[in-house]
Structure formats: C-alpha cells, structure tokens
Amino acid sequence: MSDTTLEKIIVLDYGSQYNQLIARRIREIGVFSELMSHKVTAKEIREINPIGIILSGGPNSVYDEGSFDIDPEIFELGLPVLGICYGMQLMSYKLGGMVEAAGEREYGVAPLQLTEKSALFAGTPEVQDVLMSHGDRVTAIPEGFHVVGTSPNSPFAAVENTERNLYGIQFHPEVRHSVHGTEMLRNFALNICGAKGNWSMENFIDMQIKDIREKVGDKKVLLGLSGGVDSSVVGVLLQRAIGDQLTSIFVDHGFLRKGEADQVMETLGGKFGLNIIKVDAQKRFMDKLVGLSDPETKRKIIGNEFVYVFDDEANKLEGVDFLAQGTLYTDVIESGTDTAQTIKSHHNVGGLPEDMQFQLIEPLNTLFKDEVRALGTQLGMPDEIVWRQPFPGPGLAIRVLGDLTEEKLETVRESDAILREEIAASGLERDVWQYFTVNTDVKSVGVMGDQRTYDYTLAIRAITSIDGMTADFAQLPWDLLQKISKRIVNEVDHVNRIVYDITSKPPATVEWQ
C-alpha cells in the first residue's frame, strides 16, 4: 500500500505462530493491518504513519541474551500500543517492570477476571475465557501502569497505562479460544486508536487502480496467467486499471483439469476482455516427460519447460516494461521476516529467467488468500474461478505416480471431474478445502461384465484445513463416496478399484508426490 493516509495498525513480529491471525482479525474489523519486523525503528514507524501498534507474542524470554528486542523510542511516539503475551512482557521489561520464569506455566484456556473497568474490555463480561500460552510472566509492572485483569496463574494478566496509551495482555485475543478476543481488538482499533473501520475490498480496488495507473503510465504489462485464483484476480484487476496495455500469456501444458483451459479463455478472455495469448504446449511438455517416473525430475522438467515457453512468447512482444505476479501477503511474510521458518517449497511452475528485465507489479502482495477471493467476488468474477481450489503448478502430472502416460493422465482428468461434480452436487464444495484423485500406478484384478480385468487403482484425497499447513482427511458421507466410486469405475476406462486416503497432514503431505 503506497497511500500513507490509509488508516493502518502495524503488528511487530516477535515470532508467534498467531502473528498472521492478529493482522487478519484487525482487517476483519475494517482496519488495514500489516506485519513488520521487530527491528523497525521509531523513526521508520513515524514515516509509515500508523494509528496504532501491536506487539505480538513469541517464543523468546525477554531476559535471555539475543532475545527479540524493540526500539524503546517506539513507546514515546504517543501512539496506542497493545502488547500481547511476549509483547506485554517486553513492554513491561523495557519500561522498568520485572519478568520471570513462571513457577507454573500456563497453557490452554483460563478464566480472566476483570478487576477494573477498561476501554480495552468495554462490553465484555467480568469473567471470560482466554487462551494462555506462556512460560514467563510479569511479576512487577512499570510505574504508571495498573492491573485491570488477573488469571489463576497471572496476577498481571491485563495491565494498562492510559495516560501513555499503553496496554498489555498476557493472553492471545486473536484466537477463537479467547471468546471475546475480537471485541477487545475492536475496542483497541476503533475506540483506543480511533480508526473509522472503513477499510474494504471496494476501497482497496480504488487504491490499487490508482497506484497501478500511476506506476505503469502508458507502458505495457505482461502477466503469466495460470487459470488459478491469484493470477486470474490480478488479470481482472489490471484489466480494469489499464485495459489493453495488459497482455496475458496462458500456457496450456496439458496437465490442467478437464475443461479448465476453455473456461479460462471463455471467462477471462470473453467476459472480462483480457488480451490472452494461449500457447498450446501439450505435446512439447509430454514429449519431455514420457517414461519418467521420478517426481522431482518431473517437477523440474515441467518448471524449466514452462519458463522456456513463457520466455519464447515474451520475447515476441515489444515494449513490455512490467511483469505482473500474483504474490500474496503470506509469500511476503514467509520470505521477508526475521522470525520466519523455512517451509517445504510449493509446487510452483518455476521462476522466470534472471535476464528478463521487467519491473514487478504485485497488486495482491498485501492480501491473504481469503481476501483475494473476496476481491475476486467484488470484481464480479464467477464463483467457479474465485473458489477454485489450490492446484499445483505441474498440474495433474504429479497426480500420476510412476511413469507418465496419456492413458494414466486421462484416468486422473476424468475421475477428478466426476469427483468435483459430485462434491458440488452434495453441497460440500465449500466445506472441503481440497479434493482430487491420484493414479497410484497400482493395478489389481477385478471383474466387470463377467470378464476379468486388470486395471488401475485410483485414490481419492479430500482434506479439511484452514491454510494447508496442517490438514485432516475429510469425513465424507459413505453414500457420497460410494456414488463417486461407482461412477468412476463405470465411466472411466482402465480403472477398476477406488481407495480413500484417510491420512492427515502431518505425517502425509496434501499431494502424493
């Protein structure tokens, strides 16, 4: 967001697993919020011009050498500050209080007893459940602070210094276990920080269009269109901002879901008027992969070949200065914070060549996935694109175990279409986070029409999840599974057996390879 007049509350990142959740909760209230490194200085914050600051929780102990610190001048900015868990301990410690290891650690839900009236807790009950997760606790509060809430193991569970607009809570209001946590965050954002609460997808669109037009001017923009949610939303947003200055390249590598390529062209090219160059590269990709069985080799070849195809097409265009990408805020957080952990790489189709000298445009890089979907809806995009499931860059090719053949690929494409059809008809489409079929490369004996068969076994994978980092298998109704199995076996050639994957993540990953 380039607009410094935008009301925003910044969250300083101290390593809590709930950091993103804090920003999401504030945004749900209607106030823009973003994570920043705990190394940010008071001077830098003054330039950003936020209306409030939240110090997140984290795994450190404030008294340990090398623990995450804060510029003490931040407390002198006159801005409202809310310290959560470690953030509260750090604020107390830096301002003259004491923090020690708790004699009895406090993990899980605990009753919070309010002892005084407080603007932070306005409209919440005197006794309420909150989520505690700490091994240290404040044992003496700084001068000017007073206690407004206690818990069985935390005599200073909630403290404040109203003269300096400083607030500290030992629990996590951002998680649902803290029953009235959202009300506390709303009180902080709207009443204490004075936000109007009018941040929305509608004004996000207006601001982005203004930013894009100012940045691009009369120059041209290139977009790699995959047909997924992120690149599709970027395409429609850019089309609204700069019209025919945008050119999209859509590479059909032959591993898309049934009807997907046609839908992309009809919806984005037809209804929304995007100028799309469709590259039919199915034979080119398949020729490189025939007979290969190692999943990493397949991924690498698909990624590299995609880059070569994209590069070939991009070089045919003249006068392109900008490259648009569907980078999300989660990508920025994972790669750009001091506390981020390295996670398993996603099934990306590969990076672009280093010698492609474009300026980047990433209009979604301040949004979470659910906000991208909301943006797509606000832009008038159909549900079948906005709610499209996560799909790996290499596509159906990595849902075929063993060597890749046209026959096996077709079993996955056709069975996947049946699975999606039946789950949609059952009304469970939004309840199941992701679902697909896999050709296991295992053949088994069967009987069909009094004839012995020896055909493929397909697996159905369906999971429930919030963010894909962890997942449980979806407990689909047995009659639905039976119907899906019957249809696949009857309608898809070379398949005679269906199994259901009931493994959670971890220990399994979502995809089979």
UniProtKB/Swiss-Prot annotation:
Pathway field: Purine metabolism; GMP biosynthesis; GMP from XMP (L-Gln route): step 1/1
MF-aspect GO terms: ATP binding; GMP synthase activity
One Pfam family, short name: NAD_synthase
Listed InterPro entries: Class_I_gatase-like, GATASE, GMP_synth_C, GMP_synth_GATase, GMP_synthase, GMPS_ATP_PPase_dom, NAD/GMP_synthase, Rossmann-like_a/b/a_fold
Top EC group: ligase
Keywords recorded for this protein, A-Z: ATP-binding, Glutamine amidotransferase, GMP biosynthesis, Ligase, Nucleotide-binding, Purine biosynthesis
Catalytic reactions on record: XMP + L-glutamine + ATP + H2O = GMP + L-glutamate + AMP + diphosphate + 2 H(+)
EC number: 6.3.5.2
Domain annotation Glutamine amidotransferase type-1: ranges: 8-198
Keyword Secreted: no
Residues given in the record as ATP binding sites: S226, G227, G228, V229, D230, S231, S232
Positions in coiled-coil regions: none
Active-site residue numbers: C85, H172, E174
Domain GMPS ATP-PPase: 199-388
CDD domains according to UniProt: GATase1_GMP_Synthase (cd01742), GMP_synthase_C (cd01997)
Function: Catalyzes the synthesis of GMP from XMP.
Subunit: Homodimer.
Name of the protein: GMP synthase [glutamine-hydrolyzing]
